[in-house]
From Swiss-Prot:
Function statement: Guanine nucleotide-exchange factor (GEF) for RHO1 that stimulates the exchange of RHO1 GDP-bound form into GTP-bound form. Required for signaling of cell wall defects to RHO1.
Organism: Saccharomyces cerevisiae (strain ATCC 204508 / S288c) (Baker's yeast)
A Pfam entry, by short name: WH_RGF3
Protein name per its UniProtKB record: Rho1 guanine nucleotide exchange factor TUS1
Ranges of compositional bias, category Basic and acidic residues: 12-29, 176-194
Region (Disordered): 1-144, 164-194, 219-239, 780-802
All copies of domain PH, residue ranges: 715-877
Upper taxonomic lineage: Eukaryota, Fungi, Dikarya, Ascomycota, Saccharomycotina
InterPro entries named among the record's database cross-references: CNH_dom, DBL_dom_sf, DH_dom, PH-like_dom_sf, PH_domain, Rho-type_GEFs
Notes concerning its domains: The DH domain mediates interaction with RHO1.
Biased composition (Low complexity): 87-97
CC terms in the record's Gene Ontology section: cell division site; cell periphery; cellular bud neck; cytoplasm; incipient cellular bud site
Biased composition (Polar residues): 1-10, 37-79
Keywords in alphabetical order: Guanine-nucleotide releasing factor
SUPFAM superfamilies: DBL homology domain (DH-domain), PH domain-like
Length: 1307
């Protein structure tokens, strides 16, 4: 079809086109053509000679299935029989025989009979028996848009087509030899010119039979005639019973759909044609779900006029009523069927968006003409197809090409066809790629100027349309400017750049200049090319911008993200070079002053710092303006709404990635400037967090620190210069600190040559160990961290009036009374400052909870202080999100006890939002229902014990003032003192014995639990009226423990005068209460000759047949079967090197390295070896001894390491069985297969469920930070109660319980 360069509202041009010769892109004046007889060209001639054929299968007898010729009365004469059977039609218009020859052959019908049962003149022939003659330059195509739409029009010469499946015959052979010779001569002239059609190839037809049948004779015209009806009692099982699988169907007749039918009926009885009831098709309710895989190529073959809604409707009726009448079709099934049909019939290179839009249009037309409806059955939309309707419609985007039927194809042909399926237009490359020079050398300008519109022309156009088209041109101008900028970066800056300008940045050219090439290709191919094509084909009113940009968004994400990452590096390099005034900066100025750049104003800051970022930001603004002037009924309206969100999302992602890349680039630059001496103690990395080190690695120093500064995921949160507080009232010294996402680095600036370096002066602090502390003002109970700088630093003098700031009195110098905040940096930093005013103004304090080191920093303003505090708190929050699955949760038991002034911490630890302590405090505040500061008792908590007695849980707290008790879950009432004991070291309750054992001032005594509880319940009476009397068992006792199952009985263990004494309780036979404890056994502790200089006991681990005593020096294992002196654990009998070391005569005089010296060695193996020597020589302090998960392995906890031993007391491999600790462990408990290690400022929890795992490879599953943490529970298994400093209330102790988190809580 020919079309001038004028827009048409009924046509859509797909975005992608194959390029054509450049000469055909020019605007041409086409001669006016006579009006085309379009109805005879590509529409149905459905009203000529149609017969009224009723619905149903035409019955034939069994004897007539494959026999004599059929009477003429049963021959189809409708448009379908003329098309499919090849009968002549005097009313058909002349047609090029090229279409007849290259028409896609229909698929053969399935074979139902064997070779013997099929007659020679049977219409059923195997496809494998065909011997088709094909030209070597012709390919087999199906779905050819030029051939498949016009077979219903036959030439004026009367002819009958032979069966397309007969051997040796072409399916398009003419009946007359004279006609055959003429057509073959015409075909030979055109065969070479039309060999590049872009259509789908015919897939193989899945037939397994290879029957060889004889071809039909030329005179066997009876094959294409309708067979006679069968007998009324016979079942139609002939080939025609499944004729729908081949060429025709009963639904192919237009009478069924009443399209232009002269015998339209109105009753179902008349539709059946008054046939006998047994001939009517059975009506059954469909029950089977439909599968799109059931639609094969045979069925898709039977609808080739997909541009006509009536043809699609007839084909849908076959699918619904005939082929799959037992299936239930959902809404999505019907859409998929139409989608599959169009994709099958259209060429493979056909635009997918055009297919998708036409699928929607086809379904919308069916619904509007009430041919399809959707009923909701069981919450599912079921499709219902209505038959017998007059359905009409033509889809212009699917129309075939009919303009070049009688025209020869030549390079000099100036005619242009705009059909989407025109094979000539596709093969000749009419839509060629737009050259970049055509875009950057000229601009389209304004819409009115481009089309030379006068005010009179604009007055006739809708103002909204004028605005809409003007904004579309604004998009074009925006794209042209972006491409001009990218071309300047590649052609001018890129080609003139020399790598010698940046010798340390070898990838700068690829990141700064080559990165623009994919952007140029992206914008040219997906934006400007389709938009300019629309300008040429649609005229002044173009549409479909939203769909174009939607495609662009799908392709632009990865390219733009790479561009954002590259520009971050380019920005940092340019800024760095400008700061140092290198020769690269001089080169940039020379390029900026060149003629090309001055004329185009594409300076380096415009290209590299603005670039495509600005165009991406302006894009959704312009698209939103187009949307406001777009009518909601237009198809592009929804596309614009979607694409605006997609572009905004892309813009957000690009900005986010660009920001992260900038931060990472700063970190890379900082890593190049970081200086560290390998002999410094700072070269040691942490063991439990942040990775490990290896002495054999020759990597950079940063890798030895396990900081991962060059890792892509590493982030630099904040960095800058602050002032660090020093001792002896010296002026603060400036330091440069860098907060990373995994650690905090404290450095000082140094000059090394012409560059600036940063020397690491303190050990890096991991985020897991970093704690932020704040100072409280007396009289305030709780202060939010957000107002930290505004409240605490409001006045520089308020800190000097507090009695808890522990500051020395100010010394005023008689010679100089002037003071500054941080002193003069030019003066010596070692000079003593007598004034030191404003010391705590704008300051914050951090602490390394692993080492206990603290650092106080000062900032120059409150704004900088808030930046640091917010950055640190945000780092805490992100670190907590990475460990969202906690093994334990904490419950606050009480906050009623206060510190003595000398024990109270000066600064309070900050509990980050969402941390375990913060969550526990919030839950406690809701339960308490009162001010937590309303009551407090200044004392020191010594130990705790919770007792479950008579269905209630009582919490006993031993302090220096006595023993207090209350209901554990009662947050409304406070503690009640019941026992006047002031030096309780240990307290343990045994409910089975009904006794509370207390070790007070080295006196071991016990009280009756029922008496103690009764005293608590009688709170109204005074202590003098109801005195509680206990029984003293022994004096001079330093430790005791109760065993429920040692030697199959209960025993009392205690240490007295260097011996472990075991007592057995004796019960009263009448009251079943304990009368007294009698002696059972006695074990001697090792003497000082075995290097046991201190027999102070930390704990006793009791098992069924043995027990282990943890002293301050070592662990001794005793057996129950006999009395011996015990075995020292761990045993090194399997370690020859260590045994030789222990037998060395000069062992005690060897100059062993100190702990500080050992930490200078960065090797984990060397540190492990040092820890093993400390354990063997009794330098490590034992903390506790546990059995791991009821296995044959045991865990020995020391202050600096954890050791796993087997049942023989040996380490299988000391390199794998020793876990080094980053902190000094003061207490340990074993709770639910988890090992809880407690330090002064840190709690680490390890999972020991997998006993086979190497202990040295374990990492903590949970880390809790605090201050003045102490393990308070006397029982160290399955009970863990801790005491720590309250993070929000001054001088307050916090009593918390550690409970395992259930799996349901994780989920």
């Amino acid at each position: 079809m020919y079309r001038y360069n004028r827009s048409s509202p009924f046509e859509r041009t797909p975005e992608k086109r194959v390029s054509r010769q450049e000469s055909q892109r020019k605007s041409i004046e086409l001669p006016k053509l006579p009006p085309l007889n379009t109805r005879n060209s590509f529409l149905d001639d459905s009203d000529n000679g149609t017969d009224n054929i009723s619905i149903g299968w035409t019955p034939i007898s069994d004897t007539q299935q494959f026999q004599s010729p059929v009477p003429q009365a049963f021959t189809f004469t409708s448009k379908h029989s003329a098309r499919g059977n090849g009968t002549s039609s005097s009313e058909s218009t002349p047609k090029s025989t090229k279409y007849v020859k290259e028409r896609r052959p229909p698929p053969p019908p399935p074979l139902l009979y064997s070779t013997e049962s099929i007659r020679i003149d049977s219409p059923m022939v195997s496809p494998s028996s065909q011997s088709r003659e094909r030209s070597p330059n012709k390919l087999s195509f199906i779905g050819n848009s030029e051939e498949r739409h016009h077979m219903e029009y036959i030439s004026n010469h009367s002819r009958i087509l032979k069966s397309p499946f007969a051997n040796g015959f072409s399916p398009n052979s003419p009946k007359s030899p004279r006609d055959s010779s003429k057509q073959q001569a015409h075909f030979s002239d055109e065969s070479d010119l039309r060999c590049h059609e872009r259509e789908k190839a015919l897939p193989p037809i899945p037939f397994t039979t290879t029957l060889l049948l004889s071809p039909f004779d030329d005179e066997d015209s009876e094959f294409f005639t309708k067979p006679p009806p069968p007998l009324s009692t016979s079942r139609n099982v002939s080939g025609n019973s499944r004729v729908s699988e081949a060429l025709e169907s009963v639904y192919s007749d237009s009478d069924y759909t009443f399209n232009n039918s002269n015998a339209r009926q109105s009753s179902f009885n008349s539709l059946l044609g008054a046939k006998p009831l047994e001939l009517a098709p059975s009506i059954t309710a469909p029950t089977q779900p439909f599968s799109i895989q059931s639609i094969d190529e045979h069925k898709l073959y039977q609808c080739d006029n997909v541009y006509k809604l009536s043809a699609i409707y007839e084909w849908i009726l076959k699918v619904y009523f005939e082929w799959f009448n037992e299936c239930v079709f959902t809404k999505i099934d019907l859409f998929q069927i139409v989608q599959l049909l169009l994709e099958f019939q259209m060429p493979t290179n056909f635009d997918q968006d055009t297919i998708d839009s036409n699928v929607d249009n086809i379904m919308a037309s069916f619904i509007s003409q009430k041919a399809v409806r959707f009923d909701i059955i069981n919450d599912e939309e079921v499709a219902v197809v209505v038959g017998g309707l007059d359905i009409t419609g033509v889809f212009t985007e699917l129309l075939p090409c009919y303009s070049f039927i009688d025209n020869t194809y030549g390079s000099t042909n100036s005619l242009i066809c705009y059909s989407n399926v025109c094979t000539h237009g596709q093969s000749s490359g009419f839509r060629k790629e737009i050259k970049l020079s055509e875009i950057i050398n000229k601009s389209v300008g304004l819409w009115t100027e481009y089309w030379h519109l006068t005010p009179d022309d604009l007055a006739e156009i809708n103002p909204r349309e004028v605005q809409r088209q003007s904004f579309i041109f604004d998009l074009i101008i925006l794209e042209e400017r972006s491409l001009n900028m990218a071309t300047a970066a590649v052609e001018i800056y890129g080609k003139r750049f020399d790598k010698s300008l940046l010798p340390d940045e070898p990838e700068f050219k690829a990141l700064a200049f080559d990165i623009f090439e994919p952007l140029i290709q992206l914008h040219t191919e997906f934006l400007l090319t389709p938009i300019f094509w629309k300008l040429k084909t649609r005229g002044k009113f173009i549409d479909g911008v939203g769909k174009i940009y939607s495609k662009w968004c799908g392709e632009a994400k990865n390219i733009y993200l790479n561009y954002a990452k590259a520009m971050a590096t380019v920005h940092e390099i340019i800024m760095w070079e400008k700061k140092n005034k290198t020769k690269f900066v001089t080169w940039l100025k020379e390029i900026d002053n060149s003629v090309e750049i001055t004329r185009s104003k594409m300076y380096h800051d415009v290209i590299f710092f603005g670039g495509f970022f600005k165009s991406l930001q302006n894009m959704p603004v312009t698209l939103r303006s187009i949307l406001k002037n777009t009518d909601p009924s237009m198809e592009d309206y929804e596309y614009l709404k979607i694409v605006i969100k997609e572009v905004e999302k892309l813009n957000f992602e690009v900005n986010q990635v660009h920001g992260l890349a900038i931060d990472h680039r700063k970190l890379v630059r900082f890593s190049k400037q970081l200086v560290l001496s390998t002999n410094s103690s700072n070269a040691t990395s942490y063991v439990n967090v942040g990775g490990s080190t290896n002495a054999n690695d020759d990597d950079a120093i940063q890798d030895k620190l396990a900081l991962g500064l060059t890792y892509p995921e590493r982030k630099l949160v904040l960095s800058g210069t602050v002032y660090k507080k020093r001792d002896l009232w010296l002026d603060p010294t400036p330091v440069y600190i860098a907060l990373l996402d995994n650690c905090l680095l404290i450095t000082e600036e140094i000059s090394k040559g012409e560059t600036q370096k940063y020397k690491l002066i303190e050990r890096p602090i991991p985020i897991d160990y970093l704690s932020l502390e704040k100072r409280k003002i007396p009289g305030t109970s709780k202060q939010p961290l957000r107002n930290y700088s505004q409240k605490e630093h409001k006045s520089p003098m308020h800190n000097f009036s507090t009695p808890i700031n522990s500051m020395r009195p100010l010394l005023k110098s008689s010679g100089n009374h002037m003071s500054t905040a941080y002193g003069d940096r030019k003066t010596s930093n070692t000079e003593i400052s007598n004034a030191n005013p404003n010391t705590d103004e704008f300051s914050f304090k951090i602490r390394n909870t692993a080492t206990g080191e603290s650092f106080k920093f000062f900032t120059e303003s409150a704004e900088v202080l808030n930046q640091w505090i917010d950055a640190i708190m945000e780092s805490f929050k992100r670190n907590a999100e990475n460990h969202d699955l906690n093994a334990f949760e904490f419950t606050v038991l009480s906050s009623e006890f206060a510190y003595f002034d000398k024990d109270a911490p000066v600064n309070l630890p900050v509990a980050p939002e969402g941390s375990e302590i913060d969550v526990a405090l919030k839950a406690y505040a809701q339960k308490a229902n009162k001010d937590s500061c309303s009551w407090s008792k200044t004392t020191r908590i010594l130990c705790c014990e919770d007792v479950k007695f008579e269905g209630r849980i009582y919490l006993f707290v031993a302090t220096t003032d006595g023993i207090y008790v209350k209901y554990r879950d009662d947050y409304g009432s406070g503690f009640v003192k019941i026992l006047e004991l002031n030096d309780v070291k240990r307290m343990e309750a045994n409910v089975k014995l009904g006794l509370l054992f207390v070790l007070d001032n080295r006196k071991l005594c016990y009280f009756n639990i029922s008496t103690v509880v009764s005293r608590y319940l009688a709170q109204g009476n005074t202590l003098d009226e109801n005195c509680i009397v206990g029984t003293v068992i022994r004096d001079k006792v330093r430790f005791f423990k109760i065993a429920d199952d040692f030697g199959n009985s209960k025993h009392l263990f205690f240490e007295r005068k260097g011996k472990i004494v075991i007592l057995t309780p004796e019960f009263d036979q009448l009251t079943n209460q304990v009368k007294y404890f009698k002696f059972y056994k006695e074990y001697k502790l090792p003497s000082s000759s075995n290097n046991i200089l201190n027999n102070e006991i930390e704990d006793i681990a009791i098992f069924r047949k043995s027990f282990a005593v943890c002293t301050k020096k070592t662990v001794i294992l005793y057996q129950d079967s006999f009395e011996d002196n015990g075995i020292v654990l761990p045993s090194f009998l399997n370690d020859k090197d260590m045994m030789a070391h222990l037998r060395h005569p000069h062992l005690n005089s060897l100059p062993f390295k100190s702990a500080t010296d050992s930490k200078k060695r960065p090797s984990i193996e060397s540190l492990t070896e040092e820890a093993k020597k400390d354990i063997a020589t009794c330098k490590a302090i034992p903390v506790n001894f546990f059995q791991i998960s009821q296995s044959s392995f045991f865990a020995l906890v020391y202050d600096e390491a954890v050791v796993k031993i087997n049942c023989y007391g040996e380490m299988s491999d000391w390199r794998k069985d020793i876990l080094l600790l980053d902190f000094c462990c003061t207490g340990a408990s074993f709770h639910g297969n988890h090992l809880i290690l407690v330090g002064d400022n840190l709690i680490q929890i390890y999972d020991l469920k997998n006993v086979e795992q190497n202990l040295g490879e374990l990492v903590p599953v949970q880390i809790i930070k605090g201050k003045k943490i102490k393990l308070a529970s006397s029982e160290r298994r399955e009970k863990t109660i801790l005491v720590l400093s309250h993070p929000n209330i001054l001088n307050r102790q916090l009593l918390v319980a550690c409970n395992p988190v259930a799996m349901a809580d994780h989920q």
